[in-house]
Amino acid sequence: MAYEASLIEKKWQKIWDENEYFEPKDDLNLPKKYILSMFPYPSGRIHMGHVRNYTIGDALARYYRKIGFNVLHPIGFDSFGMPAENAAIKHKIHPKSWTYENIAYMKKELFSLGFSFSKKRMLATSDPLYTKFEQEFFIKMFEKGLIYTKEANVNWCEQDQTVLANEQVEDGKCWRCGHEVAQKKMPGYYVKITAYAEELLKDLEELKDKWPNQVLTMQENWIGKSEGLEFSLNLDEESKQKTKESSLEVFTTRADTIYGVSYIALAPEHKIVQNLLSQNLLNQDVLNKIKAIQNQSPRERQSSEKEGYFLGIYAIHPLSGEKIPLWVANFILADYGSGAVMAVPAHDERDFEFATKYNLAIKQVIQTQENLPYTQKSGKLIHSQEFDNLDCNEARLKIISQFEAKNIGKRVVNFKIRDWGVSRQRYWGAPIPMIKCQSCGIVPQKLENLPITLPEDVQITGEGNPLDKHPTWKNCICPKCGKEAQKESDTLDTFFESSWYFARFASDEKTWQEKALDEKSVKYWMSVDQYIGGIEHAILHLLYARFFQKALRDLGYLTQNEPFDRLLTQGMVLKDGAKMSKSKGNVVDPDEIIEKYGADTARLFILFAAPPAKELEWNDDAVEGAYRFICKLYDRAQNVKKGELVELKQENLNKEEKYARLKVYEALKKSFEVYHQSFAFNTLIAACMEALNALALCKNEALEQEAFYIILNILEPIIPHVCFELSEELFKCKNFKKLELKEEVFVKDTLNLAVSINGKKRAEFEISSSASKEEILAFAKENTAKWLEGKSIVKEIYVEGKLVNLVIK
């Protein structure tokens, strides 16, 4: 009977669906595994990146389900976002219609691959019920002070007409559409992620050895903790008159280099710079250049060439009394420290580059024989008055103490991470549940009025915010004073939705109507045991999700500190050496692979072609090879004895049979390590192939039966349809359980030993593993007789199970 993938796969998908085979059990006393792959945006079609992500997760979910765990393996759709509005403009279709049509199609595609997702817990973040509880979280965070409003410079995408978080600006461009990003002052809502900066940093320790080091490092750098000295510098008299300011605050992490200051660098937004601008004390050329810098995103300003302009004013060094020139510089950010930095060119690369460019003084204050800039935090101080000859660390502490004693400075901790701006000027997003009242100011919606949903009678033109232009939607009554008011017309950044979906999945779906999160079930299921997704989310989704977990914990919704226990970041799928994209013409459609070869072939290729964390190069020949392997497995199974296993006696097997059985059990042993720890599915598949090849050389019916019992068990999470089909036919699926190793299989009957004479290998021989040391030495001498002739043996050494060494003279 030939292998017919389509018939087999449709048959088993129907059986699994009808029997709700993949739904988590209600028994919360069972050991659990929560396996989650990052959910997709419903763009219309799944791509090979999705297939890889979900195949990895599905293999793990199926494995743990098979060995007796209660498994939660859900899927949903991150369904709010700008592409739906872009599609509405392009295709003259409502964003909601476009989104839910795509969801319906993608669901069909996902289940055609045999993914064992829970259907009962499937959700879309644009569902009104999801929006309701998201808005509840927003209000609770607002009431706790974790969300606030402010007017600030924001990253503005002119094309999408919306605000972007710092993390959403890539090389000065919008991460979604690629348009240049400008700075624009706007009011908006901010999530106080900085309130958790210390905990977010500290808890990275808990994730070591469970998350990729690269992700941990990226988050650590993004949070950017620095400890240092914040101090005041008085301006000289003339500068006071010009700026209408008497002093400025400066932050430094290198108090030990304070005598090396040769200029102060200010952010363009600093009040001293703004005072000079407002009084027209800077020439037009400088004014234009400062405005150009202000239009750059923070990331652009720090990555572009260093630029600055002397402001014609001076500060007084607090210890030496020297005059220090003040410059405006593009690499200084207004919201880091005080927006003013003391520059020490001799001991900082950035300051050195700037000073060299503008011919500013370079004052060395740490002794070194190396070329400047010398940036190490070690060495003896020089040219630093009473702190000369002190080590850097000791000097830093003493200088900070002196500033504190004089009451002109203090020890402070700064973080690079900024609060998260979540206001977006677009239609297809969750409405921010706030009201603007002329009498009461900003007031939260009443919880009983949630969800605040979107009006459907809107015109999506791509210009401005459709909610702002709607004739009636904004109108409401203030819940506080009863007067006429207006709803907030901004919607939430879509990262807000993806920051808690994992907890919603963990909540029993029978409680979804009544509450955001069911305490009992989220306590059981959370944290996610294994999370799978791309490394591109390291400082976006993953950081926001960690914050949300902690915030919801403190609001009483959750109990765990971290959302994801283990993280796997899978590599990209490439074709012709490049990431698959329509523009490159190198896209492989999963539907075409399924139609031609079947879902199991697609799954097998994806897991065999490369380790999960590495990039995977698409190879048509390798897909063909995966298909041939499944056909071979299917054909070989037709000759396997059906029914109960016949007990095998190891001692009754010949050499070839023992070797084949060993290969089968080695594959089983490897499966434990792969499914539990390394996820190196490619090595596991290779081990199964090797076992089948060894088995082909044997003619033992009972051995072949046992081998298929085990191999189908091992491969079921990877190629489930064909393994279910064959296991049902051969064993009534009784092999789908936790299997045990048989230690006697690993015991070797013979030893292969090397014989060395005076350390030089001369021979190899095979001998019974039960042979005594005396027998082994005698056999070794017999096999090396020609080298021993006429010589006397001084010493005989036997390294058990490995070699014999004879020392002669």
UniProtKB/Swiss-Prot annotation:
One GO MF term attached to the UniProt entry: leucine-tRNA ligase activity
Gene: leuS
Record motif 'HIGH' region, residues: 40-50
Record keywords: Aminoacyl-tRNA synthetase, ATP-binding, Cytoplasm, Ligase, Nucleotide-binding, Protein biosynthesis
A Pfam entry, by short name: tRNA-synt_1_2
Motif ('KMSKS' region): 579-583
Name recorded for this polypeptide: Leucine--tRNA ligase
The UniProt record lists the keyword Ligase: yes
PANTHER family, A to Z: LEUCINE--TRNA LIGASE, MITOCHONDRIAL, LEUCYL-TRNA SYNTHETASE
NCBIfam families assigned to the protein according to its UniProt record, in alphabetical order: leuS_bact
